[in-house]
Amino acid sequence: RDLIKINTAAHQAFYYRPRVSLRELLDSNMLKNLIVLTGCPSSTLNKLLKNDDTKQAKILLDMLAKGSKQLAVEIQYHQSTDDEFRRMQSGLLHHQFDLAYSMGLPLALTNDCHYVTEEDEGIHQAYLVAAEGRVHGIEFDGTGFYLKDSAAMRGVAEYLGQPDAY
């Protein structure tokens, strides 16, 4: 029910896309029965971590932990040949691991899924061109932005040295 309430609130605040603010979520008590993840590399938490603002990141996690019975630090890993992306990802993962362990929070390994199978990448790029009126698709830093099976995700967890990430 709480997830439906959040979805309804997000559509009531529709501006180009459905949206709901963190303040609304925390004030509404809608997170209490949900598993809350901290989000992808572009999330509020991870922007703070990329800027080395661990103090504000801890404050944010404390607020989320008070609103939810189950909070986990979400981690994502994507292979890339781009050195700048790899440095950013490595630094972010380091911050995420440190923060999760220091606050006693579990890690949740997810994959940034933009399409269902690896073979769908071209179709997804065509969709982005059509939907957003671009001449070219969006360049993704890294690879593997599709729905991976549990064996592939366990492999990523092992590679990252985090076999207990769920």
Regions found by a protein language model. Give the residues of each.
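Phosphodiester-processing cores and adjacent nucleic acid-binding clamps
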Residues: 1-166
